[in-house]
């Protein structure tokens, strides 16, 4: 399945929380309590379709969404990664040195945690500015439809492959390696 190793969360007027969903789920966390606490608040994500399936798997259920990547595309930005959008709107250059890190590693080093926290630190301000621009461009209703569609698509039950071990992360890299596939299958079945 899709496993999220870190959830970064910030609520306006509050600090940033970095949550380990794997450890919390193993410890019996009741994600319904989290959903109730968040309520109808809009979740601001960048590239929501990367995160929503993993959220759905553990029981996180956003009710409203603003996706800064979708907004950037609708606004015609030529580059729509979070770093590019942040630089465009806020003039801040986000360091991306840990973007390819193995986020399953524990404990997370302090500089990784700082890196992860900075990603969400900018989202509320980005949403405010991007909503203004969407409205000015007459694209706010279109954006709302796109966000709603992304939310439904991202939280929809995933169609699982009938062969469970083929869900192993990055298994497609072994598609032309029969020996590697056999080893992966063997490890899955142990």
Task: Locate the predicted segments by residue.
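Conserved alpha/beta core segments of nucleic-acid transaction machinery
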Residues: 152-174
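Short, hydrophobic/amphipathic alpha-helical patches that form generic packing surfaces
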Residues: 71-73, 125, 190
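Acidic, Mg2+-coordinating catalytic module of metal-dependent nucleases/exonucleases
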Residues: 94-159, 185-188
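Hydrophobic alpha-helical scaffolding
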Residues: 41, 75-76, 113-116, 177, ...
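Alpha-helix initiation and N-capping motif
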Residues: 31, 68, 79-83, 139-140, ...
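Conserved RNase H-like, two-metal-ion catalytic cores of nucleic-acid enzymes
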Residues: 1-84, 88
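C-terminal accessory/binding modules appended to enzymatic or scaffolding proteins
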Residues: 169-190
């Amino acid at each position: 399945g899709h496993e999220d190793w870190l959830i970064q969360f910030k609520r306006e007027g509050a600090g940033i929380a970095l949550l380990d969903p794997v450890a919390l789920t193993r410890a019996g966390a009741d994600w319904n309590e989290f959903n109730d606490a968040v309520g109808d608040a809009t979740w601001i994500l960048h590239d929501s379709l990367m995160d929503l399936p993993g959220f759905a798997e553990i029981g996180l259920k956003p009710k409203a969404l603003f996706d800064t990547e979708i907004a950037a595309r609708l606004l015609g930005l030529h580059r729509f990664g979070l770093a590019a959008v942040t630089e465009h709107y806020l003039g801040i250059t986000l360091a991306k040195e840990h973007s390819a890190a193995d986020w399953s590693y524990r404990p997370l080093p302090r500089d990784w945690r700082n890196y992860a926290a900075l990603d969400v630190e900018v989202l509320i301000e980005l949403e405010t500015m991007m909503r203004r621009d969407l409205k000015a461009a007459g694209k706010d209703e279109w954006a709302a439809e796109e966000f709603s569609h992304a939310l439904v698509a991202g939280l929809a039950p995933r169609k699982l492959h009938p062969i469970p071990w083929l869900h192993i992360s990055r298994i497609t890299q072994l598609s032309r390696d029969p020996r590697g596939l056999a080893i992966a299958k063997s490890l899955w079945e142990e």
